Amino acid sequence: MNQTLLSEYGTSSERVEHAINALRDGKGVMVLDNEDRENEGDIIFAAETMTVEQMALTIRYGSGIVCLCLTEERRQQLQLPMMVENNSSPFQTAFTVTIEAAQGVTTGVSAADRITTIRAAIADNAKPSDLNRPGHVFPLRAQPGGVLVRQGHTEAAIDLVSLAGFKPAGVLCELTNDDGSMARTLEVVQFAKLHNMPVVTIEDLVIYRQAIEQKAS
Protein backbone atom coordinates (compact mmCIF):
# COMPACT_ATOMS: atom_id res chain seq x y z
CA MET A 1 0.00 0.00 0.00
CA ASN A 2 1.37 3.43 -0.93
CA GLN A 3 1.56 5.00 2.53
CA THR A 4 2.74 8.34 1.10
CA LEU A 5 -0.62 8.82 -0.61
CA LEU A 6 -2.46 7.95 2.61
CA SER A 7 -0.32 9.93 5.06
CA GLU A 8 -2.41 13.08 4.67
CA TYR A 9 -5.34 11.14 6.16
CA GLY A 10 -3.41 10.66 9.41
CA THR A 11 -1.98 7.65 11.17
CA SER A 12 -3.48 4.19 10.80
CA SER A 13 -5.71 4.58 13.87
CA GLU A 14 -6.66 8.14 12.91
CA ARG A 15 -7.80 6.94 9.49
CA VAL A 16 -10.14 4.44 11.15
CA GLU A 17 -11.48 7.12 13.51
CA HIS A 18 -12.07 9.50 10.60
CA ALA A 19 -13.99 6.76 8.77
CA ILE A 20 -16.11 5.96 11.84
CA ASN A 21 -16.94 9.64 12.34
CA ALA A 22 -17.81 10.10 8.66
CA LEU A 23 -20.25 7.18 8.82
CA ARG A 24 -21.81 8.63 11.97
CA ASP A 25 -22.30 11.87 10.04
CA GLY A 26 -24.11 9.98 7.27
CA LYS A 27 -21.22 10.19 4.81
CA GLY A 28 -19.45 7.56 2.77
CA VAL A 29 -15.92 6.24 3.16
CA MET A 30 -13.38 4.74 0.79
CA VAL A 31 -11.89 1.41 1.86
CA LEU A 32 -8.76 -0.04 0.24
CA ASP A 33 -7.62 -3.63 0.55
CA ASN A 34 -4.05 -4.85 0.11
CA GLU A 35 -2.27 -4.50 -3.22
CA ASP A 36 -1.58 -8.24 -3.22
CA ARG A 37 -5.27 -9.03 -2.75
CA GLU A 38 -8.00 -7.45 -4.93
CA ASN A 39 -6.14 -4.11 -4.91
CA GLU A 40 -9.44 -2.23 -5.10
CA GLY A 41 -11.14 0.66 -3.39
CA ASP A 42 -14.78 0.34 -2.41
CA ILE A 43 -17.27 3.09 -1.65
CA ILE A 44 -18.95 2.13 1.62
CA PHE A 45 -22.02 3.55 3.37
CA ALA A 46 -23.98 2.52 6.43
CA ALA A 47 -27.13 0.82 5.10
CA GLU A 48 -29.27 2.61 7.70
CA THR A 49 -28.32 6.11 6.56
CA MET A 50 -27.61 5.76 2.84
CA THR A 51 -29.64 8.21 0.77
CA VAL A 52 -30.96 8.02 -2.78
CA GLU A 53 -28.42 10.69 -3.78
CA GLN A 54 -25.59 8.63 -2.31
CA MET A 55 -26.84 5.54 -4.11
CA ALA A 56 -26.94 7.51 -7.38
CA LEU A 57 -23.33 8.60 -6.83
CA THR A 58 -22.35 5.00 -6.08
CA ILE A 59 -24.00 3.71 -9.25
CA ARG A 60 -22.49 6.51 -11.34
CA TYR A 61 -18.89 6.03 -10.22
CA GLY A 62 -18.90 2.39 -9.20
CA SER A 63 -18.97 -0.93 -11.01
CA GLY A 64 -22.78 -1.03 -10.87
CA ILE A 65 -22.74 -4.14 -8.69
CA VAL A 66 -24.13 -2.60 -5.51
CA CYS A 67 -23.78 -5.01 -2.62
CA LEU A 68 -25.52 -5.18 0.74
CA CYS A 69 -23.23 -6.65 3.39
CA LEU A 70 -25.13 -8.68 5.97
CA THR A 71 -24.40 -10.96 8.90
CA GLU A 72 -25.09 -14.68 8.75
CA GLU A 73 -27.86 -14.12 11.30
CA ARG A 74 -29.62 -11.64 9.00
CA ARG A 75 -29.12 -13.92 6.00
CA GLN A 76 -30.90 -16.68 7.86
CA GLN A 77 -33.66 -14.32 9.01
CA LEU A 78 -34.32 -13.43 5.36
CA GLN A 79 -33.85 -17.06 4.24
CA LEU A 80 -31.46 -16.03 1.49
CA PRO A 81 -29.74 -19.03 -0.13
CA MET A 82 -26.09 -18.62 -1.06
CA MET A 83 -25.63 -17.92 -4.77
CA VAL A 84 -23.61 -21.12 -5.24
CA GLU A 85 -23.22 -24.26 -3.18
CA ASN A 86 -19.49 -24.61 -3.84
CA ASN A 87 -17.73 -21.24 -3.87
CA SER A 88 -14.70 -21.38 -6.15
CA SER A 89 -13.97 -17.64 -6.32
CA PRO A 90 -10.35 -16.81 -5.36
CA PHE A 91 -11.32 -14.72 -2.32
CA GLN A 92 -14.43 -16.69 -1.34
CA THR A 93 -16.73 -13.70 -1.88
CA ALA A 94 -19.96 -14.88 -0.29
CA PHE A 95 -22.79 -13.75 -2.55
CA THR A 96 -26.33 -14.82 -1.77
CA VAL A 97 -29.10 -14.79 -4.36
CA THR A 98 -29.93 -11.26 -5.49
CA ILE A 99 -32.92 -9.40 -4.05
CA GLU A 100 -35.60 -6.81 -4.76
CA ALA A 101 -38.12 -5.24 -2.41
CA ALA A 102 -41.50 -6.96 -2.82
CA GLN A 103 -43.30 -3.62 -2.54
CA GLY A 104 -42.57 0.00 -3.38
CA VAL A 105 -40.33 -0.52 -6.41
CA THR A 106 -40.80 -0.44 -10.19
CA THR A 107 -38.06 -2.24 -12.13
CA GLY A 108 -35.75 -2.25 -9.12
CA VAL A 109 -32.85 -0.70 -11.03
CA SER A 110 -33.11 2.98 -10.04
CA ALA A 111 -31.23 4.45 -7.11
CA ALA A 112 -34.52 4.97 -5.26
CA ASP A 113 -35.59 1.37 -5.87
CA ARG A 114 -32.29 -0.01 -4.64
CA ILE A 115 -32.57 2.05 -1.45
CA THR A 116 -36.12 0.73 -0.98
CA THR A 117 -34.78 -2.82 -1.34
CA ILE A 118 -32.01 -2.20 1.18
CA ARG A 119 -34.45 -0.66 3.68
CA ALA A 120 -36.70 -3.72 3.34
CA ALA A 121 -33.81 -6.12 3.91
CA ILE A 122 -32.44 -4.42 7.03
CA ALA A 123 -35.74 -3.61 8.76
CA ASP A 124 -35.88 -5.02 12.30
CA ASN A 125 -38.98 -7.06 11.51
CA ALA A 126 -37.91 -8.04 7.99
CA LYS A 127 -39.18 -11.38 6.77
CA PRO A 128 -38.43 -13.45 3.65
CA SER A 129 -41.67 -12.43 1.92
CA ASP A 130 -40.58 -8.77 2.02
CA LEU A 131 -38.09 -9.55 -0.74
CA ASN A 132 -38.39 -10.93 -4.25
CA ARG A 133 -35.63 -12.99 -5.83
CA PRO A 134 -33.76 -12.30 -8.09
CA GLY A 135 -33.24 -8.56 -8.04
CA HIS A 136 -30.78 -5.72 -8.49
CA VAL A 137 -29.16 -5.67 -5.03
CA PHE A 138 -26.42 -8.20 -4.31
CA PRO A 139 -26.27 -9.33 -0.67
CA LEU A 140 -22.92 -10.47 0.69
CA ARG A 141 -22.57 -12.57 3.82
CA ALA A 142 -19.81 -11.38 6.13
CA GLN A 143 -17.71 -13.84 8.08
CA PRO A 144 -18.29 -13.79 11.85
CA GLY A 145 -15.27 -12.13 13.42
CA GLY A 146 -14.98 -9.52 10.69
CA VAL A 147 -11.60 -8.44 9.31
CA LEU A 148 -9.80 -10.43 12.00
CA VAL A 149 -11.06 -13.57 10.22
CA ARG A 150 -11.30 -12.43 6.58
CA GLN A 151 -9.67 -9.27 5.28
CA GLY A 152 -12.35 -8.46 2.75
CA HIS A 153 -14.38 -5.35 1.96
CA THR A 154 -17.53 -7.20 3.11
CA GLU A 155 -16.16 -7.67 6.62
CA ALA A 156 -14.66 -4.18 6.65
CA ALA A 157 -18.07 -2.69 5.88
CA ILE A 158 -19.74 -4.59 8.74
CA ASP A 159 -16.93 -3.74 11.18
CA LEU A 160 -16.92 -0.03 10.32
CA VAL A 161 -20.67 0.50 10.51
CA SER A 162 -20.80 -1.48 13.75
CA LEU A 163 -18.01 0.64 15.26
CA ALA A 164 -20.00 3.71 14.18
CA GLY A 165 -22.97 2.46 16.21
CA PHE A 166 -25.23 1.28 13.40
CA LYS A 167 -26.83 -2.11 12.88
CA PRO A 168 -24.41 -4.48 11.10
CA ALA A 169 -25.39 -3.78 7.50
CA GLY A 170 -23.30 -1.87 5.00
CA VAL A 171 -23.54 -1.01 1.31
CA LEU A 172 -20.49 -1.24 -0.93
CA CYS A 173 -19.51 -0.92 -4.55
CA GLU A 174 -16.10 -1.05 -6.24
CA LEU A 175 -14.87 2.30 -7.55
CA THR A 176 -14.07 2.30 -11.27
CA ASN A 177 -12.26 4.74 -13.55
CA ASP A 178 -13.91 6.52 -16.47
CA ASP A 179 -12.58 3.88 -18.87
CA GLY A 180 -14.15 1.08 -16.84
CA SER A 181 -10.92 -0.14 -15.27
CA MET A 182 -10.65 -0.64 -11.52
CA ALA A 183 -9.55 2.34 -9.45
CA ARG A 184 -6.28 1.83 -7.56
CA THR A 185 -4.86 3.78 -4.63
CA LEU A 186 -4.08 7.01 -6.51
CA GLU A 187 -7.51 7.17 -8.18
CA VAL A 188 -9.25 6.25 -4.91
CA VAL A 189 -7.50 9.09 -3.08
CA GLN A 190 -8.36 11.55 -5.87
CA PHE A 191 -12.02 10.49 -5.79
CA ALA A 192 -12.12 10.72 -2.00
CA LYS A 193 -10.76 14.28 -2.08
CA LEU A 194 -13.29 15.30 -4.71
CA HIS A 195 -16.20 13.90 -2.71
CA ASN A 196 -14.92 14.75 0.78
CA MET A 197 -14.61 11.14 1.95
CA PRO A 198 -12.00 9.69 4.29
CA VAL A 199 -9.78 6.84 3.10
CA VAL A 200 -8.99 3.84 5.28
CA THR A 201 -7.34 0.51 4.56
CA ILE A 202 -8.47 -2.91 5.70
CA GLU A 203 -5.02 -3.29 7.26
CA ASP A 204 -5.73 -0.14 9.33
CA LEU A 205 -8.96 -1.71 10.52
CA VAL A 206 -7.29 -5.00 11.45
CA ILE A 207 -4.72 -3.16 13.60
CA TYR A 208 -7.46 -1.02 15.18
CA ARG A 209 -9.61 -4.01 16.08
CA GLN A 210 -6.64 -5.97 17.41
CA ALA A 211 -5.82 -3.04 19.71
CA ILE A 212 -9.42 -2.94 20.98
CA GLU A 213 -9.43 -6.67 21.69
CA GLN A 214 -6.04 -6.45 23.39
CA LYS A 215 -7.30 -3.73 25.73
CA ALA A 216 -10.40 -5.77 26.51
CA SER A 217 -8.47 -8.93 27.37
Curated annotation (Swiss-Prot):
Residues binding D-ribulose 5-phosphate, per UniProt: R37, E38, D42, R150, Q151, G152, H153, T154, E174
Keyword Transferase: no
Co-factor note (free text): Binds 2 divalent metal cations per subunit. Magnesium or manganese.
Cofactor: Mg(2+); Mn(2+)
One record GO biological process: riboflavin biosynthetic process
UniProt keyword annotation of Repeat present: no
The reaction(s) this protein catalyses: D-ribulose 5-phosphate = (2S)-2-hydroxy-3-oxobutyl phosphate + formate + H(+)
GO CC aspect terms: cytosol
InterPro entries: DHBP_synth_RibB-like_a/b_dom, DHBP_synthase_RibB
Binding of Mg(2+) 1, residues: E38
Pfam families: DHBP_synthase
Keywords in alphabetical order: Lyase, Magnesium, Manganese, Metal-binding, Riboflavin biosynthesis
Pathway(s) annotated for this protein in UniProt: Cofactor biosynthesis; riboflavin biosynthesis; 2-hydroxy-3-oxobutyl phosphate from D-ribulose 5-phosphate: step 1/1
EC code(s) of this entry: 4.1.99.12
Marked site positions, Essential for catalytic activity: H136, E174
Gene Ontology terms, MF aspect: 3,4-dihydroxy-2-butanone-4-phosphate synthase activity; magnesium ion binding; manganese ion binding
Residues that hold Mg(2+) 2 according to the record: E38, H153
Family indicated by similarity: Belongs to the DHBP synthase family.
HAMAP family referenced in this protein's UniProt entry, alphabetically: RibB (MF_00180)
Self-association and partners: Homodimer.
Function: Catalyzes the conversion of D-ribulose 5-phosphate to formate and 3,4-dihydroxy-2-butanone 4-phosphate.
Protein name per Swiss-Prot or TrEMBL: 3,4-dihydroxy-2-butanone 4-phosphate synthase
Species this chain originates from: Photorhabdus laumondii subsp. laumondii (strain DSM 15139 / CIP 105565 / TT01)
Gene name as annotated: ribB
